[in-house]
Amino acid sequence: SANTFYYHFQDIYDLLDKWLDRKKNQFFAMTQLTGSWTDRLKVLLHAMQENPKLVYHVSDSITRERLERYVFTSIESQFYDLIGEKTAAMEITDETRKMMTSFFCCSLLGYVMKFLWVNMNVDIDASVDDLSIIFSGALEAMLRKEMGQ
């Protein structure tokens, strides 16, 4: 009944947020030991490609801003930690690390949005491999600039 629903959730968006968080946590738990970030991204995108109806129902049910915020906040800590690993032997400020994290999150967010716009009709493995090369080059350039080279 409606009373039961509103006892557990504020509105339909609250329900969707909780469902997305649950799915995200399941995904991260399942792929935690799976190789690199690119391997995890490939698993996620293939799962999305295999379930287009679900993906588009969810993405069409929320505003673009809400979807972008959800994706960004879901990957932010992952990139922050990854950049920390890549720069462990270097002296970079936390502010620089956060700036790099924001850059990579925004870039990946754009990649995911375009993936949705083209109806997920992409060679995921090749595309993510290309993205990884671009990210590696960008990180190297950022670190060279940071170190004054």
Predicted features along the sequence, with ranges:
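Amphipathic alpha-helical segments used for helix-helix packing
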Residues: 18-20, 43-74, 79-86
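Solvent-exposed, amphipathic alpha-helical segments
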Residues: 22-30, 107-118
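Key DNA-contact positions within bacterial/archaeal DNA-binding proteins
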Residues: 3
